[in-house]
Design a protein with these regions (language model features):
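Juxtamembrane/interfacial segments around transmembrane helices
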Residues: 69-77, 116-126, 158-172
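Cysteine-centered iron-sulfur cluster-binding motifs in ferredoxin-type domains/subunits
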Residues: 15-34, 62-82
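Ferredoxin-type iron-sulfur electron-transfer modules in oxidoreductases and energy-metabolism complexes
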Residues: 1-13, 36-66, 81-142, 148
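C-terminal, charged low-complexity interaction regions
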Residues: 143-179
């Protein structure tokens, strides 16, 4: 992305003006996953404020954008009401578009895709479909296998997915997102 363009593009596409952030740090203090991120939310904001292409590229390659769980704690705590979860969504889209995904984040992306495929196929989350899709994508078939029997016995892994009403509406949502 050309210098001087990504800050205005973010503002236009996401409605987030990164320059409004005055680095109070409340977003990072309230973030449930900040300690696992390579760049906590306040640092993401600062890196974008520098308008440096190296920082922008580093963010696209970072785990931070994939670890964000969009809980909106940062938005709730931000005195400037900066929508960091929307910004993180945008950064994930750009990372996918520019094929700059961090290899460590591939499992997170695989989980996202397995989750969406499960909802798309059944109209709601089907746990066994989610696990099967995730394990097939990551080729990590045996990890966590030991917890499956107890989850099954507690009714947490139904063999047949529940039917949902108005599955056509859910299909329509997925169709619209492809447009």
């Amino acid at each position: 992305m050309e210098k001087q363009s990504y800050i205005s593009t973010i503002k236009d596409k996401v409605g987030v003006n990164v320059n409004r952030c005055y680095q109070c740090g409340k977003c990072s203090a309230g973030c449930a996953v900040a300690e696992d991120m390579d760049y906590p939310p306040s640092m993401v904001m600062r890196m974008l404020q520098t308008n440096d292409n190296m920082n922008y590229t580093a963010l696209l390659k970072s785990e931070s954008i994939w670890l964000c769980i969009s809980c909106q704690n940062c938005l709730t705590r931000c005195p400037m009401q900066i929508d960091i979860p929307a910004l993180m969504d945008y950064m994930r889209e750009k990372a996918l578009e520019e094929k700059t995904i961090n290899k460590k984040s591939n499992n997170i992306l695989s989980f996202h895709r397995a989750f969406l495929d499960s909802v798309k196929f059944t109209g709601r989350l089907y746990e066994i479909g989610l696990v099967a899709g995730y394990k097939a994508r990551t080729m990590n078939l045996t990890q966590d296998l030991d917890v499956a029997p107890s989850m099954f016995m507690k009714g947490k892994l139904p063999i047949i997915p529940e039917r949902v009403k108005n599955k056509k509406q859910i299909s329509a949502i997925f169709s619209k997102t492809k447009e």
